[in-house]
Curated annotation (Swiss-Prot):
Belongs to the UPF0246 family. One of its GO terms (biological process) is response to hydroperoxide. This is UPF0246 protein cgR_1824. PANTHER family: PEROXIDE STRESS RESISTANCE PROTEIN YAAA, PEROXIDE STRESS RESPONSE PROTEIN YAAA. Pfam families: H2O2_YaaD. It comes from the Bacteria. GO terms for cellular component: cytosol. InterPro entries: YaaA.
Length: 245
């Protein structure tokens, strides 16, 4: 199984790895698109980048860092991304076998494996990044069907934990998706928004550490339930699971 996580806007700075080498990234079919997007992102003057990326003057260093994407140091992607989901995942305590089951969606790289070395960058899935010819394509238009095709080619069950914006960049037919819901006092259900990432991080950790390999949505549910999580199947869509918290 391959567990695809969402990226995070917040990222760890620095790194001790050599500068980015596209040939050291997984999913080589995405290389050309990655190179084009990176070149366009790196070409943005800082003041223009603030507007394009929708960030404030306070985050000017983020835009400045984008100007040196090919020379900045790298670190494994799973440690580059930070925030609520990644805190709950606690990748530093995961064994190599567990890390091999993890991938991450990305506006810049499409999808990468957890251990792929990447630099710090700023680019979100909702950005309209100018091309050299002045066009303003969406990230969805830039990626086309390439992310979907790359994930289909892994020939494994894909558990897609990406947020909606990143799922739109490359949906995967028959991928298992997860809704997080809480039970209200009156027994009704409410979709969890604030702690959604935290619970998905815990869910991903359980799957990554499983001694069993999941090949179906039912397998995923069984693994999660065995770890003490409350997971339900959707009778109308077997690939959609609900994590009840």
């Amino acid at each position: 199984m391959l567990i695809v996580l969402p990226p995070s806007e917040t990222k760890t700075h620095g790194g001790s790895g050599k500068p980015l080498d596209f040939h050291h990234l997984s999913f080589p079919s995405l290389t050309k698109a990655r190179q084009t997007i990176l070149a366009d992102l790196q070409a943005l003057e800082v003041d223009e980048a603030l507007k394009v990326l929708g960030i404030s003057e306070k985050l000017r260093p983020e835009a400045e860092s984008n100007r040196a994407l090919e020379t900045n140091p790298t670190m494994p992607a799973i440690f580059r991304y930070s925030g609520v989901l990644y805190d709950a995942l606690d990748a530093a305590t995961l064994p190599e076998k567990a890390l091999e089951r993890l991938a991450i969606g990305s506006a810049l790289f499409g999808v990468i494996h957890a251990t792929d070395p990447i630099p710090h960058y700023r680019l979100s899935g909702g950005t309209k990044l100018p091309t050299k010819s002045g066009e303003l394509p969406t990230m969805k238009a830039r990626w086309g069907t390439s992310i979907s095709e790359a994930l289909i080619d892994v020939n494994q069950l894909v558990i897609d934990l990406r947020s909606g914006t990143y799922q739109q960049l490359g949906r995967v037919k028959d991928a298992v998706t997860v809704r997080v819901e809480s039970v209200m006092e009156d027994g009704s259900r409410k979709v969890v928004s604030h702690f959604n990432k935290h619970y998905k991080g815990e869910f991903a950790r359980v799957l990554a550490l499983s001694e069993k390999e999941a090949r179906t949505a039912e397998d995923v549910m069984s693994i999660a339930q065995a770890a003490g999580l409350v997971v339900e199947e959707n009778p109308n869509h077997k690939e959609t699971l609900t994590l009840v918290v």
